[in-house]
Amino acid sequence: FQHRHRRPAVTEVRRGALPETAWAEEAGLRYRLDFQRGQNLGFFADMAPGRAWLRERAEGKRVLNLFSFTCAFSVAALAGGAHSVVNIDLSRPALALGRENQNANGFADARVHYLPHNVFRSWKKLHALGRYDLIVADPPSAQKGSFLVERDYPKVLARLSKLLAPEAELLLCLNAPWLPADWLREQAAERLPGDRMSGFTLPLSLKLLSAQPVSVFPEL
């Protein structure tokens, strides 16, 4: 159980013990879970449709993964045959877990960059690495000192056009239930005029793997 009302959030084991190593499995790919991270385990199961969307389009593409966290989108892109991937996130531990995910899925030799940088201070660096055929933006809704969705997401959108290759596609994600359903669509339409937009819902599908059997929701 996670006590998210506490600061910092506390995870309480009600019965048994947490496995030292556990993996989520989705569409034949494996993603490392870290129960010591606090309230985020390193993998967001609700973004399965986004990863499937990216994987279907990734063959031969140059992919930019903004706010990459543990690089689950990167793994999906590589599984789809991406030419190269650039992951950028402030958290070095998250990127290290992302590299572990890449290696665990057999992509150790893939063309992947891991940039432990602030996105807002890295636009020139990202541009120097080339233009991108697919860009994923899945920022935190609120991260103290670095990102507030209402203030900062529009700034990200305004920068994307200079990074896009011809016929590029974007996957723009938002987890901010306090905002209107059309907020992101409206922001994108204003800053990326002329682009077609569509959306999809997020069903949940997750299998937990570990060295020992684990009851995700044991009887109490």
Residue ranges, per PLM feature:
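Conserved class I S-adenosyl-L-methionine
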Residues: G60-F69
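Conserved SAM-binding loop of SAM-dependent methyltransferases across substrates and taxa
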Residues: T70-A82
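Short strand-turn motif at the edge of the Rossmann-like AdoMet-binding core
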Residues: P139-P140, S146, C173-P177
